[in-house]
Amino acid sequence: MPAMPGLVSVKTPSDTPPLRVAVPDTQPLSNPPRTPMKKTPSSTPSRSKPSPNRSTGKKDSPTVSSSTAAVIDVDDPSLDNPDLGPFLLKLARDAIASGEGPNKALDYAIRATKSFERCCAAVAPPIPGGSDGGPVLDLAMSLHVLAAIYCSLGRFDEAVPPLERAIQVPDPTRGPDHSLAAFSGHMQLGDTLSMLGQIDRSIACYEEGLKIQIQTLGDTDPRVGETCRYLAEAYVQAMQFNKAEELCKKTLEIHRAHSEPASLEEAADRRLMAIICEAKGDYENALEHLVLASMAMIASGQESEVASIDVSIGNIYMSLCRFDEAVFSYQKALTVFKASKGETHPTVASVFVRLAELYHRTGKLRESKSYCENALRIYNKPVPGTTVEEIAGGLTEISAIYESVDEPEEALKLLQKSMKLLEDKPGQQSAIAGLEARMGVMYYTVGRYEDARNAFESAVTKLRAAGEKSAFFGVVLNQMGLACVQLFKIDEAGELFEEARGILEQERGPCDQDTLGVYSNLAATYDAMGRIEDAIEILEQVLKLREEKLGTANPDFEDEKKRLAELLKEAGRSRNYKAKSLQNLIDPNARPPKKESSAKKWPSLGFKF
């Protein structure tokens, strides 16, 4: 992988349904909820504050927080009435259904939750447990409703504490109603954490929900299959494809046992399996799953779905360099989309982007640019119903094509437009961080190192806030370190390389090319800082890895060997150590600076060699 790699994403269907936050009924559901094929963030919610306590008789005020309302409710004696909680919960649902707004619903839900807590406290034994369910399950449902309203307001951080409380309330050992409440709470908490970009915590919640569901229903129930697929999709988003594949296989087995041959459920499973196989580079198996899914959709008369699968088949053919077959698949899908959705629909634009990429790869740059322009015309004047995620995704893919044809300024404009579309959308911080990282790469390649560092820094800040510890985060840290090197911020670069090393060693291992690249950069930085022994230690480690595990055929081996020999020689006469240009340490082929400029620049930055 190059020193400054771009970002890689898994191709998913462009017409997947958005995730909607629904307020649960007051009665527990008899079955776990069925989930969509793919989760996407919901539309932008209102960010207004909740209304104050209704018992005061005051008008709504956007300045009163939910915590204030909760404090007011604590001493209200009417909350001890066991009939008040269900009544307030009904008012909350009615407020949303009637269009009064989520602020009134939030006020009712907070008071309902307080009432249920009072009633539960009066029941022995205390929570968790309690009689046969009653107030305990009502409290759990009220907390679910409260969290859902917070989510509808876009206040996802405030939705987490009620859900964390909700999963502690029911006792799954007390029967299916408690199990369902616990399952629903874990799944809702997982969705909320996902919207906050906390993917690892989200997956942990889904896993716990699946465990509870299996204990209650058995491991072959069709509803367990739906949850397995939901969790597999989350693993795909986290780029943990082996775990995703294992769960998807289990889902496929369950659906094949309970459904007719070539069912729609099986087709959905195979489409997900194709995404996983494609991401792992197993294109032949991906193609097989897509063909079987297409046959099932054809048998069910799902013309638009067949066209979506044709696009995925085209993607596989392009990966296999079977370009004529890819063009045929794309054109077939394009004909269906134009006829069924209209010539200005975003799905049409998405096929234009695929064709643009294909013609770029085959060297037909004029045709590629023409398809890019056709797609941009659609994205610039979107039809009603087009989501900003669809537009941002399309612009991002087009920017990659412009970047590859050496038009970085146009590519940057498209990425900036994508960021602007997503910046106010909940749950998009990780996606924005990815865009900023790509912008940093482009700024770096055109020599705008200060802009590159700022872009990487913004991306790193967002990824840290989301608790990111993936290999991608390590790569971004390495890229930011390289930008700091170009700005002569040596200490900062060293810290970034050290952090990147720790993450990549954990996620990829010491023999991965990205990890080896960080080792090399860190050794060069230590050399520039005068930490010769540290630089020698790292280079000796790299050479040992190459000699014992990776082989010495790599062209970097000889360069690293020469660098180590020089460092060992210099370590023997450290008093006469000659300061080097950091640019030469990172890039041995770089031209040395003039003596007079070097003599002025290094002392002013305080470097000690």
UniProtKB/Swiss-Prot annotation:
It is found in: Cytoplasm, Cytoskeleton; Cytoplasm. It holds the Pfam family TPR_12. SMART domains: TPR (SM00028). Keywords: Cytoplasm, Cytoskeleton, Repeat, TPR repeat. Its main location: cytoplasm. Residues 38-55 have a biased composition (Low complexity). TPR repeats lie at residues 140-173, 183-216, 225-258, 267-301, 307-340, 349-382, 392-425, 433-466, 474-507, 516-549. GO terms for cellular component: cytoplasm; cytosol; microtubule. Interacts with IQD1. This is Protein KINESIN LIGHT CHAIN-RELATED 1. It comes from Arabidopsis thaliana.
